[in-house]
Structures are given as structure tokens and as C-alpha cells.
A protein has these predicted regions:
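Short beta-alpha connecting loops at secondary-structure transitions
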Residues: 5, 68-74, 180-181, 219, ...
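Structural motif
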Residues: 6, 52-54, 761
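Long, contiguous, secondary-structure-rich segments that constitute the structural scaffold
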Residues: 442, 450, 624-680, 724-740, ...
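Short, structural beta-strand-to-alpha-helix junction motif
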Residues: 3, 17-21, 317, 424, ...
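Fe-S ferredoxin-like electron-transfer domains
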Residues: 46-225, 229-233, 238-242
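A basic, amphipathic helix-loop patch mediating RNA/tRNA/ribosome contacts
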Residues: 19-53
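Catalytic alpha/large subunits of respiratory electron-transfer oxidoreductases
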Residues: 91, 95, 151, 156, ...
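Long, low-complexity segments enriched in small/aliphatic residues
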Residues: 487-491, 655-733
């Protein structure tokens, strides 16, 4: 510990603490431009200069650690004069175009000059000028080089946190520009974090350009509706219209960063295609009707249904999901309840809940990042959970840590990995079993996984020598026909590691914002809220469709889920629902599933409701209403209350009941959920008691010379489900789908990036452009599931697992 005196105030801090941080702990604010806590130290802007007793020269506080007995002055005349001079140097070239700059009103340079800057400049020379018109870098980013103050926040966050390394400095001195190599932006993730960290108006958002001033916006703190990382952000709205989404420094687990879909995926809220009126099918066609007529019809049909079921989206709030299962169980008398959950069966979802300890206490990702070894399996985390990717990359900068990634495709995070294993899709259970055997010193058999025994032994050695291990299990386990077995093999691996006295935790990587919350709330055929076992297991999604296909489902309630577009066998899903006696769909768009409904109820988007999400850590966070639902729509909670006769006045009332039913939530107060939220505190519950069945037969049968490629799917970095396709900005960034293959396959076939090919499976075929991904596993093809005009689920057949395809170069 070191005791220092700052402006006469004595404070004791940890050895090595920066003077800047010590001063802030003591209550003294020091201005900075180049410094940000999560970025590497630069010390270039010199705004943070302070005087240290006994030293002649002022020192940059952002790179200078305290020493015991040090005396520091941050506000004397010498420091103030130096600070004003630095601002004068910056203003010598900075254009004073504040009235037309989008950063006006929230510009750090503007604020610092007002507080500490000179009132008259010592410089009269002509200002440096790179261009007269701003440069449009992409559909989301505008660059004004004239305003840049060379703090290099943009360069460092792109390189160190995002991992894109799309930006760098060219030129020298005052002529330096922060830009991309030859302005190509080949590696840009379009996340907009350069916009967020820019202290001036050099990087700007094109969708927000000239739309508003910050003081005109009504700002609402909420949580991202896409993946389950649970990023916090702030919605800026004016006159009921969402104009931007931004993040706040060191706020939430995302710590100011957002991905492209989080920052730019909001325009679907104002889409012209939003549902604005209830509809009832009359004479074979949907027609607008009153709310009273629509709700009465739903009540009547479910009251008279012999067998009914409900499927809900994991993008709904905890409160909505809780009421949905309460409505289905208490009012409609059925346990046939499930969420999309990547359409896994109840045995697989139960295994995921059990193996990842979702009924136990939540585990913060920051604690998981403290592990000596991070093991990711079954997830394209860079695409499915981009901000989790950022957090893992930041942790991996510590070279004492080991990062092992196992996934068939090469992903961006591979650049930070110590070991990268490319296994054959569907063989996850074999790979994990082989790693466990190697850890236990047994013979390694990795038949059909395409991973060499030497690589498995190397990974096992790294795991065996680590004392603190974090395992991340991805959504591929929920997609895979062998997912349950793979999860149970992970459980066997954790037991083997724990038996040697090591600390190991398993966390899920989920691709829907409230998937964990859906299970916590009892939207599951086996579990009630709080993971109490239901009296008689109900049907999961697949079983509901099976029953419906045989004419055995009288009424189906589908809330926020597009079953036809997303279920892995579109033809079967459509055919099954066509035989249901009655279908009600509650959604914000007229999806393919909604088009089949007998009644359609228009609900609300995440920006139009209050409630909570529970992210993949088990962190409960508030979402807050920023605007009213579009004219004619109603909040989902309101609709459920009307159907069930519930008398809750607000989401907080429902949450109070959740606390009684789900013990892990009992100590959480709805109105006190600010900042980083609260981790659930449950108790260990053994749920499955299942044993893995090594289904090598399914993997071995995958060999097929006629269809040599295994086709896998998932989310693209710029999209999540079909929802983000309604955001025009994201659609502009990735306007059309593609098929991705490995560099080895492309070389053998004589195919290059951009070539048109036909992807032909047993049940479907499409024409797409090729993207070549060097480092991916040979024999694996990938098509994102996000494109409405290319329904990749048509390639799948229920019960057959991973489809096989052939790729034919178009002439």
C-alpha cells in the first residue's frame, strides 16, 4: 500500500495505482482525452499533467504510478496553465464548427475548453484542413479528419477490444489521420465503437446524422434485445421515435462497447411493417378486427380445446414469460409449454440447465475471465455473442492465460487462442469424451471428430496444468442431435477435473437475450418457475409439432416466435401447424407463422415495455419503456393479463410474485435494479440424472460422396434471428446471404470469393455467392439463418440432424 497526498488530502491506495486513478478516488477530477481504463496506456494528449513535489517537470498522471510519500498537485496555477496551453494547441487546428457538428452538446473538447481552456488563442495561422466534405466510410460511419485530436481511442478499441484492427494512423505530426489501410475497411465489424469512444465529432453515426441534439432526446437506460450477453445501452428518443442507441463508459458488463446489431439494430421498432391491429381469419384471409373480438375468440377456443400448447420467444421479459406459463398452466390447463431454445428437445435443454448450473447461483463473466484457462466449445462466439467475444479477447491479452477454442469454422477469436480445434459438426460429444480420457491418462479415441489425438493431448495437458478453469458451452449443443450427450460429457469432464482439486465452472453462451430467464420462469415442459418439477411433463416444441401434424392439437398459442421460419424443417413445421385446430400468434410483425394464424395479436417491442431480462450469467437487469407501443398495438403483459383475467398493474407487481415462486430471485428488488443488475442466488438442484449415449453411428453415417459438405447454420455477426433483418441499416451492411467454405475446399474446387454457386441438398437448393474462410474445417459449409429470402431451414429434415449438401460452381 502507498500513502500519498493529493492537493493536501491524504489517501492510501494499492501499490502501482496510477496517479490519475488515485486522484479520482480522492474526489479530484483530472481531464483526459487519450486515457480509458480498459485500453492500453498512451499518455499522448498531456491533458492529465500534474505536478509532483520535488520534480521540476509536470508528469502525465495516466501513466505515472504513485509512490509512498508522494505529494501531487492537480489544480495549482502551473497545472492549470499547462492544461489551457494543451487545449490551445488542439484548438489551433480543430475547426470551430460546433453548430453543425453532431457531437455538439456532448463533446469532451467543448466541455474541457469551457471549463479549463484559454479565452483567446495564441495562434493565428491557418488551420490544417484535410477535406471540405466529410468522408462516408460505410452505411453507419462518417469521418471528419479535420476534427481529429489524435487521442487514438478509436485505434486502440478496434485493435485491443474488438479485435478487428481496422484502423491505424497514417502521416506524421499534425498531418496524421486515423483511418483504415487504403480506406478499404476490409476487417471492420461495423460495431460503431469508434464512434462511441471518439471524444470529438471525428467519427460520427450516419443513421443519427443531423437528426437531433442530445438535449432534445429523452434518454432511457435499458438492455439489448439480441443475444444473451446482456449489454446495457441508452435509447435516445424524440417525439416517440427512437433516433439512436448508445452506451455509457464503464456501464454494464459491456463497459461502453456494443456490437453492430446492438448499436444499429433498433430501426425495426419504427418499421412500417409493424402490426398495428388485431386480426381474425375470415373466409381464409386475415382481416383487421377489434381487440375485444380477437381476445374473446382466443378465450373461447382455448376454453373448448381438448389439447393445447404454447410456444414463447426467449426475447420476452421475465414478467411476460412468467405470465405466459401461468396462463397456459393455470387457465388453459396444460404443461405443453416451451421456448424456441434453438428447438432442442426437453432432454437436451434439461441437460444444458443442469450442466451449466442454471438453477444455482449466477456466475459473473468477470469472475469467469479470471480463470487460468478458458475453454470454449460449441459456439461461434464472435458471431453469436460479440461482446462476450470482446471480454474473452481482453482477458486473453494476459499471456499467462490459455484460451482453447473448439469450433468447426474459423472465428475471429481464433486470433487470440492458444489452441484452436476444428471438429466435425455433430461430434462434440466424441471430442469432449476424448479430452476427458486424456485428462484421466486413458487412451484417446477421437474417431470421426476430425481432431488429431496429438491436438487432443495438447489441449488436455493445458487443462490438466490449469488450476482455475472456465468452460463456455454454446448454442450448438441446443442445435445438435448429439447435444444432450455432449453436455453430459462436459459434466463428466468437470467431475474429472474437480476430483483433482481444480476449480472449474461451466457457463452457457446463449443467442437469445432472455433464454435463461425463460427457463427460470418455467417456460419449459418439465419445470415450473424456480425449476420445481411440474406434475406430469408436457410436450417440447418438437413434440407439439408432432402432435399437431397428426391432428392432435386443438389450440396453439405462439408468442413472439416464428416457428415456420426458424424450426429446422420448415416444411414439417408448416404442415404440422396447418393441421392445428386453432392458432393464435402474438408478435410485432406478420411473420410466416403469423400468416397461418386464426388470430393475430400485435404486441410491443423491447423499447415499448418495462420488465427484466436474465442474461446468460444469471444477471437480472431492468429494461425500461422508452416510447409507447405503435398505434393499435398493446404491451404483451397487458394482452396476457386480459386473457388470463390477471390484475397486475405493472411489471413490478409480476416480479414480486416471481420472487415468491423462484427462490433464486427472492432477494432482488425490481425498483433497485440499476447499474450492473443483480446475479441470481439459487441452490444446487440435480435435474437430469441422464447418462450420455455415445452415438457414433450418426457421425459415421455422415460420409456421403454425393453430398460431401456438412451444412451448419447460426447467426451472422450483423444479425440475430430474423428480427435484425427488419433493421434497414444492418440489411445495408449485409444485403444478401452467402455460403462459406474452407480455403482448402475452395482451392480444390477452383472457387474464389464472390463466385456464384448452387448449394444443393436432398430437400432444397439455392444459388448464393461464395465466401472463403481460411482455417475452417474442410468439408463444412455455413449459411446464416438470418435471411428471409433464403430460409436455410428448408435444408433440414426433422430427426436427421446435420444436413449434407453439394456445392456446384455456376457456369
Amino acid at each position: 500500500m502507498a500513502t500519498v497526498k493529493i492537493n493536501g488530502k491524504e489517501i492510501t491506495v494499492e501499490d502501482g495505482t496510477l496517479i490519475l486513478d488515485a486522484a479520482r478516488q480522492a474526489g479530484f477530477e483530472i481531464p483526459t482525452f487519450c486515457y480509458q481504463a480498459r485500453l492500453s496506456r498512451l499518455g499522448s494528449c498531456r491533458m492529465c499533467l500534474v505536478e509532483i513535489g520535488g520534480q521540476k517537470k509536470l508528469q502525465p498522471s495516466c501513466v505515472t504510478p504513485v509512490l509512498h510519500g508522494m505529494e501531487v498537485f492537480t489544480e495549482n496555477q502551473t497545472v492549470k496553465s499547462a492544461r489551457a496551453s494543451m487545449l490551445d494547441f488542439l484548438l489551433a487546428n480543430h475547426p470551430l464548427d460546433c453548430p453543425t457538428c453532431d457531437k455538439g452538446g456532448e463533446c469532451e473538447l467543448q466541455d474541457f475548453v469551457f471549463k479549463s481552456g484559454p479565452r483567446h488563442s495564441a495562434f493565428s495561422e491557418k488551420k490544417r484542413r484535410f477535406h471540405d466534405k466529410d468522408e462516408i466510410l460505410s452505411p453507419i460511419i462518417v469521418k471528419n479528419h479535420n476534427r481529429c485530436i489524435h487521442c487514438e481511442r478509436c485505434v486502440r478499441i478496434c485493435d485491443e477490444v474488438v479485435g478487428a484492427s481496422a484502423l491505424g494512423g497514417i502521416g506524421r505530426g499534425a498531418k496524421t489521420q486515423e483511418t483504415s489501410f487504403w480506406n478499404t475497411r476490409l476487417d471492420c465489424d461495423h460495431c460503431g465503437n469508434c464512434i462511441e469512444v471518439c471524444p470529438v465529432g471525428s467519427f460520427m453515426s450516419l443513421p443519427y446524422r443531423y437528426k437531433s441534439r442530445p438535449w432534445d432526446l429523452k434518454e432511457t437506460d435499458t438492455v439489448c434485445p439480441y443475444c444473451a450477453t446482456g449489454c446495457q445501452f441508452t435509447i435516445g428518443a424524440r417525439n416517440g421515435e427512437v433516433l439512436r442507441v448508445r452506451s455509457k463508459i464503464e456501464t454494464g458488463i459491456n463497459k461502453e462497447t456494443l456490437c453492430a446489431r446492438g448499436r444499429f439494430g433498433y430501426p425495426f421498432i419504427q418499421s412500417e411493417k409493424r402490426l398495428k391491429s388485431p386480426m381474425i381469419k375470415k373466409n381464409g384471409a386475415l382481416a383487421a378486427c377489434s381487440w375485444e373480438e380477437a381476445l374473446s375468440q382466443v378465450k373461447l377456443k382455448f376454453a373448448n380445446a381438448g389439447k393445447s400448447a404454447g410456444i414463447a420467444s426467449a426475447r420476452l421479459t421475465n414478467e411476460e414469460l412468467y405470465l405466459f406459463q401461468k396462463l397456459m398452466r393455470n387457465t388453459f390447463k396444460t404443461n405443453n409449454i416451451d421456448s424456441g431454445s434453438r428447438w432442442a428437445d426437453k432432454a437436451t435443454t434439461t441437460a444444458m440447465i443442469d450442466v451449466c448450473g442454471l438453477a444455482d447461483e449466477g456466475v459473473s463473466i468477470s469472475d469467469a475471465m479470471k480463470a487460468d484457462l478458458i475453454f470454449i466449445i460449441g459456439s461461434s462466439v464472435s458471431d453469436e455473442n460479440p461482446i462476450t467475444d470482446y471480454l474473452i479477447r481482453t482477458a486473453a491479452l494476459d499471456k499467462r492465460k490459455t484460451l482453447i477454442i473448439t469450433y468447426p469454422r474459423r472465428i475471429k477469436l481464433d486470433n487470440s487462442a492458444s489452441i484452436s480445434l476444428k471438429y466435425r459438426p455433430g461430434s462434440e460429444h466424441i471430442l469432449v469424451s476424448a479430452v476427458t480420457a486424456a485428462i484421466e491418462g486413458k487412451a484417446v479415441k477421437a474417431d470421426f471428430s476430425d481432431v488429431s489425438e496429438a491436438d487432443i493431448a495438447m489441449a488436455a495437458k493445458k487443462i490438466s496444468t490449469a488450476s482455475n478453469i472456465s468452460v463456455f458451452a454454446g448454442t450448438d449443443f441446443l442445435r445438435s442431435i448429439n447435444g444432450k450427450d455432449a453436455l453430459l460429457e462436459i459434466e463428466n469432464m468437470t467431475k474429472a477435473i474437480k476430483s483433482s482439486g481444480k476449480n472449474i465452472r461451466v457457463m452457457p453462451l446463449l443467442d437469445r437475450c432472455n433464454q435463461r430467464g425463460a427457463w427460470d420462469m418455467g417456460v419449459h415442459p418439465v419445470f415450473l418457475p424456480g425449476y420445481k418439477t411440474a406434475a406430469g411433463a408436457g410436450m417440447d416444441c418438437g413434440e407439439i409439432l408432432d402432435a399437431s401434424s397428426k391432428g392432435g392439437m386443438d389450440a396453439v398459442y405462439i408468442l413472439g416466435e416464428d416457428v415456420v421460419s426458424m424450426y429446422p424443417d420448415a416444411g414439417f413445421a408448416r404442415g404440422a401447424l396447418s393441421k392445428a385446430g386453432f392458432i393464435v400468434v402474438q408478435d410485432i410483425f406478420l411473420t410466416e407463422t403469423a400468416k397461418m394464424a386464426d388470430v393475430v395479436l400485435p404486441g410491443a417491442s423491447y423499447a415499448e415495455k418495462d420488465g427484466t431480462f436474465t442474461n446468460q450469467e444469471g444477471r437480472v437487469q431492468r429494461i425500461r419503456k422508452a416510447i409507447q407501443p405503435v398505434n393499435g398495438a398493446r404491451g404483451d403483459l397487458d394482452i396476457l393479463c386480459s386473457l388470463g383475467g390477471f390484475r397486475y398493474k405493472c411489471a413490478g407487481d409480476v416480479f414480486d410474485e416471481i420472487k415468491k415462486e423462484a427462490p433464486a430471485y427472492k432477494d432482488i428488488t425490481f425498483d433497485s435494479l440499476y447499474g450492473k443488475g443483480v446475479l441470481v442466488k439459487g441452490e444446487k438442484i440435480a435435474l437430469s440424472g441422464q447418462q450420455p449415449v455415445n452415438r457414433k453411428d450418426i457421425v459415421s453415417q455422415a460420409e456421403d460422396k454425393q453430398y460431401p459438405f456438412l451444412l451448419i447454420t447460426g447467426n451472422h455477426l450483423l444479425h440475430s434471428g430474423k428480427l435484425s433483418q427488419k433493421a434497414l441499416v444492418l440489411k445495408q451492411l449485409l444485403p444478401e446471404p452467402f455460403v462459406e467454405i474452407s480455403g482448402k475446399d475452395a482451392a480444390e474446387m477452383g472457387i474464389k470469393d464472390g463466385d456464384m454457386v448452387t448449394v444443393k441438398g436432398r430437400y432444397h437448393e439455392v444459388r448464393l455467392k461464395i465466401r472463403v474462410k481460411k482455417g475452417s474445417l474442410k468439408g463444412v459449409a455455413f449459411i446464416a439463418e438470418n435471411f428471409e429470402d433464403i430460409p436455410v431451414n428448408l435444408f433440414f429434415k426433422k430427426g436427421e440432424g446435420i444436413p449434407r449438401v453439394k456445392i456446384i460452381k455456376s457456369s
